[in-house]
């Protein structure tokens, strides 16, 4: 395992593989919530040093009433944005360069989020672990979790957990040949 690799993805999807409605809507995520259960998200967030978001995901979360990543370094990948909010920084360049820079800055545990971004990092061989929370709903259409990836990624299931809401959480480790 290369030490400079961003390590984790934590994402929710519908049973049919969508992470958002066609318009980017996330209201359906509420189907997975019961009571105060956070499905390990707080523990996950406490274990990361920084987040890398794609432009689309950034634009969705920027519309939230409260910035959800307080206290974490947030890097937005985009070739089209000119600026981002003060709590984030903009990056346009090679993913391997970003991973190496973060490692040398002491950032070792990174959450990569957003369908296109996750796909690009998988294609680059820069993801070690994926946690997928499957929400018990079929959307029928929307934004898929994975885009075309020109690299096969062998995954090893490390744990599963089901919840009363119908949510099923799958944790995978990505096998790397390096």
Give names to the regions the model predicted.
Residues 1-178:
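Enzymes that bind and transform nitrogen-containing heteroaromatic metabolites
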């Amino acid at each position: 395992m290369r030490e400079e690799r961003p390590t984790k993805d934590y994402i929710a999807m519908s049973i049919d593989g969508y992470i958002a409605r066609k318009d980017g809507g996330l209201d359906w995520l509420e189907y997975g919530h019961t009571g105060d259960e956070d499905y390990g998200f707080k523990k996950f967030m406490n274990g990361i040093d920084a987040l890398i978001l794609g432009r689309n995901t950034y634009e969705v979360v920027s519309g939230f009433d409260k910035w959800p990543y307080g206290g974490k370094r947030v890097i937005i990948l985009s070739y089209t944005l000119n600026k981002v909010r003060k709590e984030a920084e903009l990056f346009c360049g090679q993913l391997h360069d970003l991973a190496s820079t973060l490692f040398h800055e002491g950032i070792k545990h990174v959450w990569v989020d957003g369908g296109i971004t996750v796909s690009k990092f998988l294609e680059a061989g820069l993801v070690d672990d994926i946690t997928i929370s499957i929400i018990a709903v079929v959307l029928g259409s929307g934004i898929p979790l994975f885009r075309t990836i020109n690299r096969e990624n062998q995954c090893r299931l490390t744990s599963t957990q089901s919840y009363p809401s119908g949510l099923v959480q799958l944790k995978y480790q990505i096998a790397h040949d390096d």
